[in-house]
C-alpha cells in the first residue's frame, strides 16, 4: 500500500484500523466524524506515517499508513 501512497494523494481513514489502534486507546476514544466521512490529502510521508490534511478547519494529523487507503 505504501507504494501507492505519495504526496498529494487523496486518502480516506479506515475506521477499524484507527479505532483499534494503540494511538486511539491512549487518547480520547471519541473520534470526530470528519475523519471517516471526508477525504484527506497526504502532505508528507515517512516510513510508517503520513501527514494528512482534511478540508475542515482542524490541524493536520499524522496517521499510520495502515490506517489510511488511497482513493481511486
From Swiss-Prot:
The keyword Hydrolase does not apply. One of its GO terms (molecular function) is quinone binding. It is a peripheral membrane protein. Its EC number is 7.1.1.-. Its main location: membrane. Pfam families: NdhO. It is found in: Cellular thylakoid membrane. Keywords: Membrane, NAD, NADP, Plastoquinone, Quinone, Thylakoid, Translocase, Transport. It is an enzyme of class 7 (translocase). It catalyses: a plastoquinone + NADH + (n+1) H(+)(in) = a plastoquinol + NAD(+) + n H(+)(out); a plastoquinone + NADPH + (n+1) H(+)(in) = a plastoquinol + NADP(+) + n H(+)(out). NDH-1 can be composed of about 15 different subunits; different subcomplexes with different compositions have been identified which probably have different functions. Belongs to the complex I NdhO subunit family. NDH-1 shuttles electrons from an unknown electron donor, via FMN and iron-sulfur (Fe-S) centers, to quinones in the respiratory and/or the photosynthetic chain. The immediate electron acceptor for the enzyme in this species is believed to be plastoquinone. Couples the redox reaction to proton translocation, and thus conserves the redox energy in a proton gradient. Cyanobacterial NDH-1 also plays a role in inorganic carbon-concentration. This is NAD(P)H-quinone oxidoreductase subunit O. It comes from Synechocystis sp. (strain ATCC 27184 / PCC 6803 / Kazusa). The lineage of its organism: Bacteria, Bacillati, Cyanobacteriota, Cyanophyceae, Synechococcales.
Amino acid at each position: 500500500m505504501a507504494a501507492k501512497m505519495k504526496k498529494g494523494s487523496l486518502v480516506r481513514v479506515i475506521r477499524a484500523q484507527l479505532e483499534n489502534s494503540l494511538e486511539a486507546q491512549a487518547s480520547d476514544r471519541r473520534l470526530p466524524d470528519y475523519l471517516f466521512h471526508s477525504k484527506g490529502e497526504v502532505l508528507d510521508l515517512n516510513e510508517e506515517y503520513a501527514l494528512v490534511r482534511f478540508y475542515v478547519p482542524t490541524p493536520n494529523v499524522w496517521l499510520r499508513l495502515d490506517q489510511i487507503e488511497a482513493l481511486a
